[in-house]
Structure formats: structure tokens, C-alpha cells
Amino acid sequence: MLRYLVSAMALLTPNSFAQQQSSQNPPGWPCAGARAVDPTYVQLAENTGGEVFLFDRSESARSLVLMQEGMKHKETVFRTSGTLARGYRDFQFPVDTTIESLLFSISLQCTQSVVIYRPSGAELDASAPGVDDNRYHAGRIVAMSRPEPGVWQVRIVGSGLFFAVVEAKSDVSLHSVRFVQLGGRPGHEGYFPMTTPVRLNLPQMLQASVSGSGVTGFRMINSGGATLQPLALAADENDQEEFQGPVIPSHKDFRIVVEGRDSRGYPYQRIFPRLFHAEP
């Protein structure tokens, strides 16, 4: 899986695009990514479950923190991407008690601010114990240990292309999602990965493997994180970590999310980062 793409556009000297932005925005408001980001980068990152983070040329030496921390944080608890015209946008997501540490990687092409709020509503203090806060021209990367459970919030202020991804170190994992079809020799039939594309508006069988208990449901989401449709997957009677059920994809592009509750009753969610594509 390709996890990170650093856009080359972020390493170029600002041109008229950035100059137009600066004429509208407060003085000193940085705008990394001098030209429009190549959509090929964005699509490749989305398809593989990776992300685009825009670094200025002067920040290249500090970009390694994203890959170093990414190796430690394998579970996606939240992700969204899109384009912010102007203003701000808030994102909320649950953090459960199984999470040992979190990695926030938020990139916004023309960043005014990126703010992280704890469940209490207090802003995350960069100097707090266990917090490694890294700020860039076009975003923020924060690694923190032992986050308190509850609903966290990220607010981005600015404009342009954005990716907001939150990953965790946790034993609860949605580690496999696959569309399958019935096959095998007579008397030895079973489900195998589909060899044909996923089809739009047709019934197909979906399997998911979850490490962890307390699963309450599955759903499809789009690239922006909005729910598209609920999914009725049932646990295998012989293996409570395996789930399967018929699915009729009603949207062309989607991701799969599992939701549940931990042993203390806190809600959790895990996102399978790969973007699925359904063809007519």
C-alpha cells in the first residue's frame, strides 16, 4: 500500500496562484503548492489508501517524521479529503481506550490554522507531555501517546486541497476487506477473491476481517468521510473476527468502515483505507 505522496508542486516557487491568494488572505498566510496539485497524485493516494501532504522546499528535511510515525500507526480511525473553498471545516471522530497513540497528519494547501480539540473541548497543547507537534507551511503533523477516549475534533482554516488523516496504534484493526465469489471443485466450494471488477447496483458478497470484539456494524463512506449506506455483515459462527454478507454498491467510489464499542463502552471506528471502485 502506498501510504504517502509528497506533492512536487509544494516544492516550487510560488507563482501567480499564490500571489492571487496572498492578495485575498491575511499577510504572511502561507500557501504551499504553488500550482494546482496534479490530480494524478491525489487519485493515486486515494486509490491506495495513502495521502498527499504538501511540504514547502525548505521543509523537506522535516518531512521524514510522517513516514517514521506512520510505520508505528497502522490503524486508520479517520480520513477525509477534498477542496476547501474558503473558511473553515470541522471533523469529529471517536477515540477508544484500546488506542495507545495517535498520529494526526493534516495538510491544507493554503493553511491559516489547524487546531486539534480534546474531548473536553480544550485545544491540544503542543507542550503537553507525550505530544510531538510539527507545524508546516501547509499543515500539521502531531504524534501523541495515551490520548483520552471520547470524541476528538480537528478544525482546518484556509483554502485549497486538503487531506486529514488520523491513524492509531491499537489492537482493534480492520485488517482485510474483500469482495468474494463462490468457486472451487464440486463438494469443495468456497468463497475466493473476485477476479472481476466490483459492479455497481448488483448484489455481491463482501468479507471483512476484524481484530477486536464489540463490533456493532459496518458502513460505506465516500472520500469525504460521509456515510453512503449501511452494510449488513454477519459474524462467522466459527470465527467471530470474520464477517460476511451481500452488498449492493450504490455508489461508484467508496471505503468500508467498521464500528463497535470497546470493553469500557467507548465507541470505536476503523477505516479500511483503500478506495474501492464499482463499475456499471
Predicted feature residues:
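Surface-exposed, short loops/turns at beta-strand junctions within beta-sandwich domains
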Residues: 145-148, 246-253
